[in-house]
Structure formats: C-alpha cells, structure tokens
C-alpha cells in the first residue's frame, strides 16, 4: 500500500504500523484559531456532552445538572419533538463524517441535517468543476515507497534506491506545487539502516509499479480534497506546507535563505464556484441555499423563532438564544404583579400597562400607547400598510404576529402546550392567559384600589365601578 503524504492533520494522524512504510512520513500540526466563539447551540451541546461526574458533590446533583444542561441545549420549551429529533440526528450525522469534512461543515453552523447535506453537495459540485487541479512540478517530484516484505528483511540494491516520479492525474494540473510543513517528531527512516532495509522503491516489476501509480493518483485525489477544505476561507485550519528533510538531515529546502523553494508557499485556493442562489428581491448571490433563506427574511420580515417567555419573535435562532438569556439573569426590579426586570427602564415601561400611562399618541386619531412600537403598528391602520403576506392564500397583515398566527391555520400547528393539563395553543398570548389559571398569576391591577386580575378584560370591567359606568364583577 502506498503512503499518502498530502492532506490535513486528521488525515495524517497516527496510523497502524503496517501503513507507515515510507521514509518520508510527516506529521502535520493543526493550528487552531483561538479566541473564536462557538455558536451558542454548539456551546450548550458541548457543555452537556463534556459534563463530568466529578464536577458535582453527589449523584443527585449530577443528575439535576445534566437535566439543566440538556434543556439549555435542546430547549424543549421552544422546540417541538420533531425539532429536537432533528438536532440529535444532526449531531450524529456530524459525528460519522470524516474529521476533515466534520470541521468544515461545523464552521458553516448548519441548523439541520438537511442543511448539512446541502453544504456537502455544494462542495462536491465545486470540486467537480474545471480548474480544480493540481500537479507536482518536475523538479519537485516525490518518490513513492512501498513495503515489500512483512518480515522487514528485504534486500536492497543501489539501483533499487533510485526515486521514481509520482505520476499524478492531469485533473490536478494548474495548482502548482504543494508542500507539507513538518512539525513535532520526525520519523527519519533514512538515518537508520535497519529502517531503510524495510523500504525500497517498487521498480522490480514494471507492470506492478504502473498499477500502483494509478492507485496513488486516486489516493492523491482524495487527499487533495482535504487540502481544498483546508484552504477554504471559512475553515478553522490555516494553510499548511510540506517540508521534507533529506537522508543526512540537511536543512530543508523550504527553509533555505534566498532559495526559490523557500519563497514558495501553498498556492491560493482557486476562485470558488459560481454562487448559484440569487435573491429575487435585491439580486444578492449566495453559495448555498441556507444562507439565501436567512437573507430573504430581511425582505419578508419573517420571524419564525418565538420566545415562549414573552412572545417576542426573531428571524434567526442565534438572536433568540441571546434574547432568552435575558430571562435567566437576575431581575432586581420587581413589579407588584409579580413580574421582575433586569433594568429599571424595563420596569417603567411595564408599569405603564398598570397605570395606563400612554406617552405615545397617534396624530390621526389621538389614541395613545405605552410603547413606540405599539404606535408604529397602530399607525398602519391609517396608512393601510400590510407588509406581511401569507404565501399559502395571499392574505396580508399589518403585523408579523398576525401573519404567524394565521399561518398556523394552514399548518394546524399548536406549538404552545400546557405542561399542567396538556392543552395546546397556536399563539403564545392564548397560552399565557390559560397558564395563569394554574399559576394564579394576576398581572393586571387597579391603580385606584389595588385589586388584581388575571386578564385585562376583567380589569376593564372592574374599573367601571370607579368611573360610575357599571357594577363591579
């Protein structure tokens, strides 16, 4: 079996002894990009997978902590069973990928297994395009070594030690030379006569050599793919060079001052393939469909990721993750209704709901609102603007929340399920109203007498007592 000397670090990692038969074995050291932040979802997954029993004082605490870490990763309060299943399938799919592909796919942060497959298919098409070729220059041809004796006692002759040129496929012409930078401990077979006796060139049988050269070219193709991945701008591994020492341990060619070889480096990756995914709205192009899907949300205003705590919606899952942390931090500012806030300004905005303070007034009808966003949404009633349209039936809405609720009529989706009684709802506001039955929460209170209510409609009925419009319920 011929030894491959080109590729990424994972490809050139420790191998079985029978495969390490050449005098030119090299070890490539990965250069990790330090200080680069992992995606939030990946960070939570790693915390869950890497949690150790020794991190807790006892088994009960360990189990409790595992539950917390699992919920932070899978987020069952916002994900359906199908979405959680998809996360687990995606994790296992990335696990079974070759390490060089696994690192490349993870850099693109796919949100589903289907998206990961699309990325890999795009990469395959890119590799099949013309121009993705490589050749070894005539003056830099490397010998191909073959192990011909399992006992390690093969005879040697002067003629057998002459290097044979490595014939690469014409498919790889145009990239120029590829070098591998050696690091760590080298395996210097040439300096030990006993090791040299175990290896010699496969020139005894010309027909056998031709067949093996063909298989070496095929093997080189596989390793070239690894080099392509290593050279991608998005990959975490930096470019790597090859530096081969000669038998006497002289200075490597790449490190010779002023030498032509020393000035050569890994060639820049060829221009990537055409960006096939084009936005119909603005004409911007993308290399994969997932990025186009995310970009289109800037035009449609779609926000499919909804916080179950407050109902706020986001266009990207990463933004929802960042927002969700605001519900987990300390909230020193408490309202009489039981809600707490991390900032005093948020408490003041909330209290306007109780005091009915409304500093934002519509110039057309005089109606006032407690928040600026509410005024903007209300103003669309006068302008008739309905920027959110349903793709199924064409119906338009002035608010994204209205579109989201409407679309669930087509899908039948009811993502908000009560853990107490199992009842499901298609909108977070309906779920929150129902949940107060179980918790006894009464967030609406009368500023005249301090009485609290679980719904705003009940508060309105009660306030008629103070205004003289009717009896208290």
From Swiss-Prot:
Keyword Transferase in record: no
Annotated Pfam families: SCAN (PF02023), zf-C2H2 (PF00096), zf-H2C2_2 (PF13465)
Organism, scientific name: Homo sapiens (Human)
Biased composition regions of type Basic and acidic residues, renumbered to the chain: 258-272
Subcellular location field: Nucleus
Cross-linked residues, Glycyl lysine isopeptide (Lys-Gly) (interchain with G-Cter in SUMO2): 27, 221, 232, 349
Official protein name in the record: Zinc finger and SCAN domain-containing protein 21
Top-level taxon of origin: Eukaryota
GO terms, biological process: cell differentiation; male meiosis I; positive regulation of transcription by RNA polymerase II; regulation of DNA-templated transcription; regulation of transcription by RNA polymerase II; spermatogenesis
Disulfide cysteine pairs (residue numbers): none
């Amino acid at each position: 079996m011929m030894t491959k000397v080109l590729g990424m670090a994972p490809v050139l990692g420790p191998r079985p002894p029978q495969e390490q038969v050449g005098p030119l074995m090299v070890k490539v050291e990965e250069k990790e990009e330090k200080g680069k932040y992992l995606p939030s979802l990946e960070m939570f997954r790693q915390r869950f997978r890497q949690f150790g029993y020794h991190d807790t004082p006892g088994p009960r605490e360990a189990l409790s902590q595992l539950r917390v870490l699992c919920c932070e990763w899978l987020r069952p309060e916002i994900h359906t069973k199908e979405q959680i299943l998809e996360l687990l399938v995606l994790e296992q799919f990335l696990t079974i990928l070759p390490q060089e592909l696994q690192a490349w796919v993870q850099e693109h942060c796919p949100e589903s297994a289907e998206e990961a497959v699309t990325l890999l298919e795009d990469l395959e098409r890119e590799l099949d395009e013309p121009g993705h070729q490589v050749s070894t220059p005539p003056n830099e041809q490397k010998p191909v070594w073959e192990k011909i004796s399992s006992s390690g006692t093969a005879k040697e002759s002067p003629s057998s030690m002459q290097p044979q040129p490595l014939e690469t496929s014409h498919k790889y012409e145009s990239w120029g030379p590829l070098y591998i930078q050696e690091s760590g401990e080298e395996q210097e077979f040439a300096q030990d006569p006993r090791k040299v006796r175990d290896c010699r060139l496969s020139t005894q049988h010309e027909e056998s050599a031709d067949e093996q050269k063909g298989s070496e070219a095929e093997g080189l193709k596989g390793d070239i793919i690894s080099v392509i991945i290593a050279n991608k701008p998005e990959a975490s591994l930096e470019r790597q060079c090859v530096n081969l020492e000669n038998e006497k341990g002289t200075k490597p060619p790449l490190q010779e001052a002023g030498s032509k070889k020393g000035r050569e480096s890994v060639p820049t990756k060829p221009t990537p393939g055409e960006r096939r995914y084009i936005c119909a709205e603005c004409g911007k192009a993308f290399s994969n469909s997932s990025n186009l899907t995310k970009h289109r949300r800037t035009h449609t205003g779609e926000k499919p990721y909804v916080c179950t705590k407050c109902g706020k919606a986001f266009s990207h899952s990463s933004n929802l993750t960042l927002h969700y942390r605001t519900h987990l931090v300390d909230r020193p500012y408490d309202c009489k209704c039981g809600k707490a806030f991390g900032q005093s300004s948020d408490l003041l905005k909330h209290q306007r709901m109780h005091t009915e303070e409304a500093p934002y007034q519509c110039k057309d009808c005089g109606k006032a609102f407690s928040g600026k966003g509410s005024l903007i949404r209300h103003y669309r009633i006068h302008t008739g603007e309905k920027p959110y349209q349903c793709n199924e039936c064409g119906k338009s809405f002035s608010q994204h929340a209205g579109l989201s609720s409407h679309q669930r009529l087509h899908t039948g989706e009811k993502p908000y399920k009560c853990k107490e009684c199992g009842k499901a709802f298609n909108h977070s506001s309906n779920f929150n109203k129902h949940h107060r039955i179980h918790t006894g929460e009464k967030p609406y209170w009368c500023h005249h007498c301090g009485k609290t209510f679980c719904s705003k409609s009940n508060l309105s009925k009660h306030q008629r007592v103070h205004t003289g419009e009717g009896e208290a319920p």
